[in-house]
UniProtKB/Swiss-Prot annotation:
It is a lipid-anchor. Transmembrane segments: none annotated. This is Penicillin-binding protein activator LpoB. It comes from Pectobacterium carotovorum subsp. carotovorum (strain PC1). The gene is lpoB. A lipid is attached at C17 (S-diacylglycerol cysteine).
């Protein structure tokens, strides 16, 4: 019985505790439509014009490469009819250059002469893929170029790179004997615009 009395007393005490008074409710805010302002278009004062973007400079790879190839073909120690691996030209400048065009100009300059038998591009691409190299990646180092030349049974490898400032680049070419790694010929020149 005392238990029931204690429970009832606790219930009465708790129900008698003051609770928070109900907060007054506010009426909802009314929304007033606002007219959007029409933006004014700025007008340029007469005489001001938009500056022209810089013109893209084109490089004359054929005119830059052909004299170097002519020098190379007359170098001592070059055996006519030998198999030559032409490595793709490497870009060592401070910007971006159309290196694929340079490699194409190198191939066309060498294929017009009869001094070398060039490793076909398809065979070179297949060999790079077999060795786990990217097809359009320049080999990056002379030792990799010589290793690839050994893989395709070439006697010579032509390593070329373009260096310096992108606005006035220099092309360097080295003809190397695959068997020994000896540099048979080396030449360089400015890339013409």
């Amino acid at each position: 019985m005392k238990k029931y009395l204690g429970v009832i007393l606790a219930a009465l005490v708790l129900t008698g505790c003051p609770s928070r008074p109900p907060e007054p409710t506010e009426p909802p805010a009314t929304i007033e439509p606002v007219e959007p302002q029409v933006p004014t278009t700025p007008t340029l004062p007469p005489g001001e014009s938009v500056p022209q973007p810089p013109k893209i400079q084109t490089l004359n790879w054929e005119a830059s490469i052909n004299p170097l190839v002519a020098q190379m073909l007359q170098a001592d120690g070059v055996t006519p009819g030998s198999i030559l691996l032409v490595d793709s030209v490497k870009n060592n400048t401070n910007g971006s250059l159309p290196i694929a065009k340079a490699t194409g100009a190198l191939y066309s300059a060498l294929s017009s002469g009869k001094a070398f038998t060039l490793v076909p591009r398809e065979q070179l691409a297949a060999a790079k893929q077999t060795l786990g190299l990217s097809v359009d990646d320049s080999l990056g180092s002379r030792s990799k170029a010589i290793g690839l030349a050994r893989y395709v049974s070439a006697q010579y490898v032509l390593y070329s790179d373009v260096s310096g400032d992108v606005k006035s680049p220099q092309i360097d070419m080295q003809l190397m004997l695959v068997q020994t790694g000896e540099i048979v010929w080396s030449g360089n020149g400015a890339v013409q615009h």
